């Protein structure tokens, strides 16, 4: 493929530089990591939070890069094909899309602070129950027929993403649901994906170490509607969040077919919910039709996630009857209010990914209706991340749980004792146990009939990062081990 094919009509400032010999440059691959450059590759130099790709242009050229695309103002390399444009990140995404050239026919993306993984997972399951070969891409990795791969990023980099989409298409996958993180949207990682529909779940405090304000955080998420979703496409929005009105306004301004779901929804209207220990039932209205739905998962927020997923499925050709029928067979996403086991006395032990204030509040509130005893929570806060949320989460835990144990959760380069102290300052009556495994053992050991334990923060993760080293650690495994020792 020639570099002119990648520039196309989307990047006239690049096309204007591709004259003479430059127009004939052949591209054998694309990367934004100079260490991965192979002879004939195109190196796209993007500025990151820790390093600027422009500093590695010489390294990329020495490894055989056939050309370099970098940001405006990048110094020219003598005799080297270095082309400067205003938005190399967007070019990287579009170029990766053009280079790999294939994706599943029906793609949807979901953004929001919480619920992205569950919505993507549920949408995939609804499609699959309707007979389609379907995949999901997100925080827990990739799930598709014949493959389950753990991933570390909610939204992969553009090159990895489009390579994956091409592989899925070649494997016969026709439908795919993916998470769209604020980082991924802000960094243009999804700009080359062709979407059939998109969704918004909610907005709460998160990534304040990256976004200067919550308004910037919301604006990054709204790029999904304003820049990526084709005009006139369905935009499914959860209607009961404090930021729903802003999301609806953004989607309407972009010219989309807005479809709201929830208690205030007009596409899928939630009229009644009954909570049970391991399941929920609800009445929903779609137009003049009334449906009784059953979701085999605990937690009010899972009803919200299920409705958003049903909205996406219905917006991509699935009937309401088929979508709601599929909800009865849902399997929860790994580490999302996942029941790991119970004591001999029947106390339940869950693992949940809640690592931000709203998510912690949601999960603690969700288990209260079926908890006849005490709600016990074990949690911590990550190092080198938003420090402002630590006392907020401490207050939430002490207010909504009966027993709180504060422990470590990926302290990274920070001093664990300092992180715990910042949480404990607002966590009235909490117990501090730094060793996470010991904290889990202590929590399980105190459980009585009717109690519910939530081990929050890690969910599906299988490591504890201390300093620069990630040590093997699984909340699931530690909970099972503690239950087995009773």
Swiss-Prot record:
Family designation: Belongs to the MurCDEF family. MurE subfamily.
Record keyword Calcium present: no
Organism: Rhizobium meliloti (strain 1021) (Ensifer meliloti)
Protein name: UDP-N-acetylmuramoyl-L-alanyl-D-glutamate--2,6-diaminopimelate ligase
Subcellular localization, as worded in the UniProt entry: Cytoplasm
Residue numbers carrying N6-carboxylysine: 221
Its EC number(s): 6.3.2.13
Binding site for meso-2,6-diaminopimelate: 385, 409-412, 457, 461
Annotated UDP-N-acetyl-alpha-D-muramoyl-L-alanyl-D-glutamate binding sites: 34, 154-155, 181, 187, 189
